[in-house]
Amino acid sequence: MGRLLDTIDSPTDLKKVPVEQLPALCQEIREQIIQTCARNGGHLGSSLGAVEINVALHHVFSSPQDKLVWDVGHQAYAHKLLTGRREAFRTIRTEGGLAGFPERHESAHDAFGVGHASTAISAALGMIEAKRVTGEPGKVVAVVGDGAMTGGVAFEGLNQAGYLGRNLLVVLNDNEMSISPNVGALSEWFSKKFASRTYNRWRRQVKEFLESVPKGPEAIEIIRHGINATKALVTPGILFEGLGFHYVGPVDGHDVKGLVETFQKLAIFDGPVLLHAITTKGKGYHPAESDKATRGHGLSFFDVATGKPVKKSPGAKAYTDLFAEALCEEMEHDPRVVAITAAMLEGTGLIKAKQRFPDRTYDVGIAEQHAVTFAAGLACEGIRPVVAIYSTFLQRAYDQIIHDVALQKLPVTFALDRGGLVGADGKTHQGAFDLAYLRCVPGLVVMAPSDENELRHMLHTSLQHEGPAALRYPRGAGEGVALEPARVLEIGKGRLVRNVPGKPDVCVVAAGTTLKAALAAAEALAAEGVAATVVDPRFVKPLDEELICAEAARAKRVVTVEEGCLAGGFGTACLEAFERRGLLEAGLGVRRLGIPDEFITHAEQAKQRAWVGIDADAIAAACRALVGDRKARGVA
């Protein structure tokens, strides 16, 4: 007998499956997700925990007329399997394959593109309001989970949704875990769930009693207020009810039959509703369920039988790990240094700091804006905070960087992990914009280390600097250099790492870890008789104009390289310096290499670098073209 899953090419097919067979279908979906994630990596735990929610939603609602909006998108693997992408699912997160997150261009069933947390409620509210304006039929459901309720924007959406009173359904997928364990008083309050029959019976009895008691006599009003106060102490939904939502739950998020029945009732409910579903992250796969740290979040390749990662050949440590070790050294030597992250203890490596310095390491939840202003407050009182955060997520706190940190010249260090191209996570997670959006902030020092030692030196430098500073480093392994003791670098001073005797044909100025590719390109060019010097600028801001402009003028041709967006980035900073010093008018030939004006899709990092033209071959080709073009025009 074949799989039920193989008979489903659309949500319409799913509706034909009897409710009694849905548990078997859920098991098949889990097996498919596990097998695929083992080969491709991905967000295993969240997707396994939300299988029944996915199946029940598609069994009751009619996508794409009814809009299903997934917060973050980690929970949506089953959604992809049920919406005509079963065969293509094996390609998820691979070059040319399905994206790891919902994307509007990929399917009409992906109502909203996601990747960053806490956005679903606001987007869903916009959709239901648009339906009201246009008269278009259909329901809208926002599925919120994976810690997204620790993000302030989720409550901003809830606040307006309750005020407007539209027929919006919010499903709170409560698995007690974000990427790191949920933190904060609000999360702790959520965790005090009452799923027992005793609690639910008591809740029904209180509700029935309150409805039966008439208003009027003072004594009865006192009773009503007293019982309502008691209810407020023990009902998990009181916060949502206070925001204008009808609260339902908690319910078992793995009882697919019960969920179908509940969704059928809620589909005809008038007004905003929040359904509180209790799930287990990694449900049905013991290694993911038992992983208390991440429960299968963002896994690479793993062995299905054990859940253990498939070991790669030994290589250099990841920049994330090197940063974490360097930070722990700084915290060991300076008690003023503290570490802050936004729900990414494992991802940023700060779990090491948390283990060694639990009272000086803060996980603030998915609250990047708060993280930055919290750091600013600490810095005001003499503390040296280090905010470790993915480059793509720091975008969410841009106003706080400018207004709360830079404007006040506070000594906050921003450690930007995943700077540049990130590989399989794709468009929503590329760290493409940080150099551009940080270098325009007055007084902010911006550094890009080219190897592990440079990272150590730059972290140490930032902690001695009496002002704000940022260092950004890529995803993946370092260069494998022998480590040196950390030392203070002179701010705004780069280094000439490859010189040539006499007059060079071209100068390559390579920011950050593009230096390795630039040096390889220079070696290849040397074999062809083209002499190239190579500069490591170290600082994107303040730029070492003396060194860069001197080497550019010496060669009369310069190629800038960065793993960041070309618009407003490092190459633009160099152009501004060349203009200030009259080099452009003097005939300097310039080529800028970096990420073009587009969102780069998912693939291996090496392939992405080749796509955008910043690998060694592309750098060498740009140098050849510049040298050849200049010589062809008779320019020395």
From Swiss-Prot:
InterPro entries: Dxylulose-5-P_synthase, THDP-binding, Transketo_C/PFOR_II, Transketolase-like_Pyr-bd, Transketolase_C, Transketolase_CS. One of its GO terms (cellular component) is cytosol. Binds 1 Mg(2+) ion per subunit. Binds 1 thiamine pyrophosphate per subunit. Its cofactor is Mg(2+); thiamine diphosphate. This is 1-deoxy-D-xylulose-5-phosphate synthase. CDD domains: TPP_DXS, TPP_PYR_DXS_TK_like. The keyword Metal-binding applies. Signal peptide: none annotated. Homodimer. Its EC number is 2.2.1.7. Mg(2+) binds at D146, N175. SUPFAM superfamilies: Thiamin diphosphate-binding fold (THDP-binding), TK C-terminal domain-like. Thiamine diphosphate binds at H74, G115, H116, A117, G147, A148, N175, Y285, E368.
